[in-house]
Design a protein with these regions (language model features):
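Beta-strand-dominated extracellular/periplasmic modules and repeats
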Residues: 6, 10-316
Length: 316
């Protein structure tokens, strides 16, 4: 290929056909960043702009297509409030949150053991869930569903010792597939709660065995799934944020092994180590199933020694 017919595309230096579009435009945009710009933005924006501009050039995006994307973002913004984050849902179905989760929490550890794997936060977490006592139920006003005793320990993954004062923030859907803020028939804060471990690091509470459900598809995320000929289903799961003083918090989910969507989660969040078995429970009138799961946290000190990103403790 001659020099007249080849050029660098600006992203990775690979050779492509010369664009018939202004080859200097992207650099002009990048150079407008001022000397007092946020350091992290100044670092990442050139890469973002080059990839974004090259995408538009390579696919010859038209004004109509561009405006369709803008309108989708606008619609996601209009639909979002304290009870629903449609913009985050759109990124979820594109796998972006799961990818960022992997990048953010990947631990540079060569040991065979590791802290509990992370999974995406999702758009339905609510801040300040009610604090509950160990052994309480997070189920309120629901007669249907398979009641479950979930229990286990929160452990230091280096020493295996129990962690006192670890907080577990928990939430999951009702049998109808809706989180309580989506469903006016559910009591406020239903199927949510925060529990704090004692000296033994143990936790236990009653919940429901979760069911698979479709993500909300009445907005831009659903329209995009339809255009891509994809299903909206998520496998049954329970959400957790587990934190403790001096330890790196984790955001994660546990997934029911027997769910039929365990292999094709619409937001790509399932990890093998987070797949669990709900066992039949006998002798407990409050529960039909039993679920045992231990969470392992890395201390900030251990994280620093391994050179883990995000190893600095920050105020909540």
């Amino acid at each position: 290929m001659s020099n007249a017919s080849a050029a660098s595309n600006g992203v990775d230096g690979s050779t492509t056909k010369v664009s018939r579009f202004d080859p200097t435009f992207t650099d002009k945009v990048i150079k407008t960043t001022g000397p007092k710009a946020n350091p992290r933005l100044a670092q990442v924006m050139p890469s973002l702009l080059r990839h974004l501009h090259d995408f538009c050039r390579e696919n010859e995006i038209t004004v109509d297509e561009y405006m369709a994307a803008v309108n989708m973002m606008n619609e996601a913004g209009r639909m979002s409030d304290e009870k629903r984050n449609e913009g985050q849902l759109v990124t979820d179905i594109l796998g972006l949150e799961s990818l960022v989760d992997e990048i953010t929490y990947k631990l540079a550890d060569e040991a065979g053991d590791a802290p509990t794997a992370t999974a995406i936060l999702g758009p339905f977490w609510r801040q300040d869930a009610p604090r509950r006592k160990m052994g309480d139920s997070i189920v309120s006003g629901i007669k249907d569903g398979d009641h479950t005793l979930m229990h286990g320990r929160v452990l230091d993954f280096d020493t295996g010792k129990p962690i006192e004062n670890a907080e577990l923030d928990i939430w999951h859907t009702a049998p109808n597939g809706l989180y309580e803020q989506q469903d006016p028939e559910q009591p406020d804060w239903n199927l949510r709660g925060r529990f704090t471990t004692g000296p033994d690091g143990e936790y236990n509470f009653y919940c429901l065995r979760p069911t698979s459900y479709p993500i909300p598809y009445d907005g831009p995320a659903g329209k995009l799934l339809t255009l891509l000929d994809r299903h909206p289903m998520r496998p049954a799961h329970i959400h957790f944020i587990v934190s403790a003083p001096g330890y790196k918090p984790i955001v994660t989910q546990v997934f029911d092994r027997r769910d039929k969507h365990i292999e094709d989660d619409s937001v790509f969040a399932v990890k093998d180590s987070l797949v669990v078995d709900f066992e039949p429970k006998h002798g407990d009138p409050k529960a039909q199933f039993d679920l045992q799961y231990d969470f392992k946290l890395a201390s900030f000190e251990a994280a620093k020694q391994r050179g883990m990103k995000g190893a600095t403790e920050v105020a909540p």
